[in-house]
């Protein structure tokens, strides 16, 4: 049973304010929706179910019923989900405003309780106070939230989430903010509400309250590519692909954490709802998460034997070689930038190997191959540098004055020559480990400069940020022939 969903359904009928603010897609007529993929809690109705992706941020956080309203916790329209969403530093006053909003939308008094009990008893065999008939009265006010960090901004989506031990495949984690407020004050609020309930329901209310107000915070999760719509992931190989998102907007002039105060002034709240509209944005996929996804896909297709081969062609253009031919049927190769990086990295590595080690054919089995598997995964800095260090050590470097050197006197292509000139100022004949790391980073950074990339895509930006970028024409950062550096 989804307690929050039931509470919205029943309390929606008590006045005009609630009829507008407590409207949920899950309580309305179902409409066709995108297929579900992950298990977790819908941020809109707070029930644990199968989730589909949100049209506002492309992350999986909405159920197939609520998706029809297209609400996102990053919206600018003061719908219930947005008013329950807080950002970054949350103060005691902010939490007091949230509790006041709950008290306004979900009041508990003798009149309300009698009204709901009388409504339930109109049905046959409902003279007893059983929890399934009064689930909407058993929603305590808690400071339980699902939290996520997006590029330095931390969001808290408050609500009443049942069954906290259920499987959670979303990037949101449970955070309890009761210590910022005051446990005793929150206890007093709930004990007062509980006093209006029949004795047979009070125990269930108390159990729910304490279980949701005394839990230990979960460890914050890291957002990764699997948390975004499969439609986006399937098109990452296209350099000019743009993500289409929609956001619900209004003339919301409050600070982010003060949206919940709107329900105190009903006329002003309805005036603001009149300004509600939908804004459409086309944004770039450029970010560390998606870049790492593409580089990992290419890493799985690496043929390390090429670095000991004598092929005259580029690494991705070798055909009819059992050890070096790359399977070009994978969509990751449709991105010419990935091909360029792969070709130049392996052209440079082959020159290093041929300059220092006497290996004559690509069919030979060498220890160096096992370290080549990670040369593209530059986003995992520690693992990547360890891989380069092991490759360097396999080249039998010569040590002089505590510095190790390797030779570099084999032919390379013009692209690699240009990288050498730009990164270290010349085409050298000896290289240190630091030189090798710098050169290989430069080959990748020419197309994917992760040093200046945000971690998550622009779909996780707030409306204010999107509007500023849209004004500067920066929401679509793509061009089929221009690199990051250019």
Swiss-Prot record:
GO BP term (any one): symbiont-mediated suppression of host cytoplasmic pattern recognition receptor signaling pathway via inhibition of IRF7 activity
This protein's record includes keyword Zinc-finger: no
Region (Important for cytoskeleton localization): 82-176
Localisation per UniProt entry: Host cytoplasm, Host cytoskeleton
GO cellular component terms, A-Z: host cell cytoplasm; host cytoskeleton
InterPro entries: Rotavirus_NSP1 (IPR002148)
Post-translational changes noted in the entry: The C-terminal region is phosphorylated by host CKII/CSNK2A1. Phosphorylation of the DSGXS motif is essential for host NF-kappa-B inhibition.
Main location: host cell
Pfam families membership: Rota_NS53
Quaternary structure (record): Interacts (via C-terminus) with host IRF3; this interaction leads to IRF3 degradation. Interacts with host IRF7; this interaction leads to IRF7 degradation. Interacts with host CUL1 and CUL3. Interacts with host BTRC.
Reported function: Plays a role in the inhibition of host innate immunity by inducing the degradation of key host factors required to activate interferon production such as IRF3, IRF5 or IRF7. Associates with components of cullin RING ligases (CRLs) including CUL1 or CUL3, which are essential multisubunit ubiquitination complexes, to modulate their activities. Recognizes the host NF-kappa-B regulator BTRC through the presence of a DSGXS motif in the C-terminal substrate recognition domain.
Protein name per UniProt: Non-structural protein 1
Classification of source organism: Viruses, Riboviria, Orthornavirae, Duplornaviricota, Resentoviricetes
């Amino acid at each position: 049973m989804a307690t929050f969903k039931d509470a919205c359904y029943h309390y929606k009928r008590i006045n005009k304010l609630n009829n507008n603010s407590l409207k949920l897609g899950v309580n309305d007529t179902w409409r066709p929706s995108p297929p579900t993929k992950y298990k977790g809690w819908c941020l809109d109705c707070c029930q644990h179910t199968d989730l589909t992706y949100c049209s506002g941020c492309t992350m999986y956080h909405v159920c197939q019923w609520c998706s029809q309203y297209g609400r996102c916790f990053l919206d600018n329209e003061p719908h219930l989900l947005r008013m329950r969403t807080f950002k970054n530093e949350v103060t005691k006053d902010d939490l007091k405003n949230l509790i006041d909003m709950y008290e306004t939308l979900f009041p508990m008094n003798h009149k309300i309780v009698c009204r709901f009990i009388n409504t339930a008893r109109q049905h046959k065999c409902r003279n007893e106070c059983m929890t399934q008939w009064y689930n909407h009265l058993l929603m305590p006010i808690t400071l339980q939230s699902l939290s996520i960090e997006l590029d330095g901004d931390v969001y808290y989506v408050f609500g009443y989430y049942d069954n906290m031990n259920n499987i959670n495949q979303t990037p949101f984690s449970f955070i309890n903010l009761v210590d910022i407020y005051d446990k005793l004050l929150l206890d007093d609020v709930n004990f007062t509400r509980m006093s209006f309930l029949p004795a047979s329901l009070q125990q269930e209310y108390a159990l729910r309250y304490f279980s949701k107000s005394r839990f230990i915070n979960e460890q914050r999760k890291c957002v990764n590519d699997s948390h975004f719509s499969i439609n986006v992931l399937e098109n990452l190989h296209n350099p000019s692909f743009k993500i289409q998102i929609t956001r619900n907007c209004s003339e919301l002039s409050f600070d982010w954490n003060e949206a919940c105060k709107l329900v105190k002034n009903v006329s002003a709240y309805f005036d603001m709802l009149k300004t509600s509209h939908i804004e459409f944005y086309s944004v770039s996929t450029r970010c560390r998460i998606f870049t790492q996804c593409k580089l990992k896909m290419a890493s799985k297709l690496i043929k390390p034997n090429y670095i000991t081969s004598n092929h005259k062609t580029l690494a991705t253009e070798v055909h009819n070689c059992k050890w070096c031919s790359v399977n070009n049927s994978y969509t990751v190769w449709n991105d010419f930038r990935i091909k360029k990086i792969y070709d130049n990295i392996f052209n440079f590595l082959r020159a290093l190997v041929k300059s220092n080690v006497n290996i004559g054919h690509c069919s030979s089995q060498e220890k160096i191959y096992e370290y080549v598997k990670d040369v593209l995964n530059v986003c995992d800095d520690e693992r990547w540098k360890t891989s380069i260090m092991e490759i360097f050590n396999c080249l039998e470097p010569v040590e002089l004055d505590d510095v190790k050197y390797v030779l570099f006197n084999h032919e390379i292509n013009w692209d690699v020559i240009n990288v050498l000139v730009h990164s270290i100022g010349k085409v050298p004949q000896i290289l240190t480990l630091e030189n090798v790391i710098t050169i290989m980073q430069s080959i990748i950074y020419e197309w994917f400069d992760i040093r200046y990339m945000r971690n998550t895509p622009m779909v996780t930006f707030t409306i204010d940020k999107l509007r500023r970028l849209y004004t500067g024409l920066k929401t679509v950062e793509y061009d089929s022939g221009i690199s990051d550096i250019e």
